[in-house]
A protein has these predicted regions:
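Exposed substrate/partner-binding surface patches
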Residues: 13-48, 53, 60, 64-190
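Active-site nucleophile-adjacent alpha helix/oxyanion-hole segment immediately C-terminal to the catalytic cysteine
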Residues: 1-11, 62-65
Length: 190
C-alpha cells in the first residue's frame, strides 16, 4: 500500500544519484553528510507519508581519549522516549532521550582515530524535524525480577508541543528558536 503512495521514480539510475559510498566519503562536513543521507533515504522511499512523518537523527560518538567525533545520521518515523519514575511532562522525556550516555566496559566501541576500544560519550540530537512528530512513551522499566510498568501521568499539550528549548553543546547557552530550524541538543557531562 505504501508503494502506491510513492512519488513516481524512474527505474534507471539518474545522473548524480547518491550512493551509500558517497555518504561515507571522508572529509565532508557533517551538514553535507546529513544532506546526502537524507537524499539517499528519499531516493529509496519518497512519498507523502515520508513528507509528513520522516525526520532525521544525528548520532554523535566522542572518544574520551582523543576527542575524535564520529557522526552518523539516521532516519526516524517515531521517537521512543524513556520515562523516569519522576517524569511529569513530555519535555522531560525528550531531554532524557537526548541525554548523553557513557559507553564503557562491555559497550566500548572502537574509536575510528585511535583504532582501539575506548570509553566514549554518545548522544542523539534532531537534525530534521518531521511535519508530524510521533512520540512513543517507553512505559516499561527494568525491575529486580520483572519489567515493571510505569504508570505515572505525563503532561503534554494536545497541539503545538514546544521543543524550542535548546542547550548548545559547549557554550551551555540557552537558546530559544524555531524547532524546524534549530537542533534539540543534549546535556553534556562536561
Amino acid at each position: 500500500m505504501i508503494k502506491n503512495l510513492q512519488y513516481f521514480q524512474p527505474q534507471e539510475p539518474k545522473f548524480g544519484e547518491i550512493t551509500y559510498k558517497d555518504i561515507e566519503e571522508e572529509g565532508i562536513s557533517a551538514e553535507e553528510k546529513s544532506r546526502r543521507c537524507w537524499r539517499f533515504y528519499l531516493s529509496k522511499d519518497d512519498s507523502i507519508v515520508t513528507d509528513l512523518f520522516l525526520g532525521q537523527f544525528r548520532s554523535t560518538l566522542r572518544c574520551t581519549e582523543c576527542q575524535h567525533e564520529s557522526v552518523t545520521f539516521e532516519p526516524f518515523w517515531i521517537v521512543s522516549v524513556p520515562l523516569a519514575k519522576d517524569t511529569i511532562d513530555i519535555q522531560e522525556c525528550m531531554e532524557l532521550f537526548v541525554k548523553a550516555e557513557t559507553l564503557d566496559e562491555d559497550e566500548m566501541p572502537t574509536c575510528e582515530a585511535c583504532k582501539q576500544r575506548r570509553k566514549c560519550i554518545k548522544w542523539y540530537s534532531f537534525e530534521k524535524w518531521p511535519s508530524v512528530l510521533i512520540i512513543h512513551l517507553k512505559r516499561f522499566g527494568p525491575s529486580a525480577s520483572y519489567r515493571a510498568k510505569l504508570t505515572n501521568k505525563i503532561q503534554t499539550p494536545l497541539r503545538n508541543l514546544d521543543l524550542r528549548y535548546v542547550e548548545l553543546e559547549r557554550d551551555r547557552v540557552i537558546w530559544h528558536g524555531s524547532p524546524k530550524w534549530q537542533k534539540f541538543q543534549p546535556k553534556m557531562p562536561w
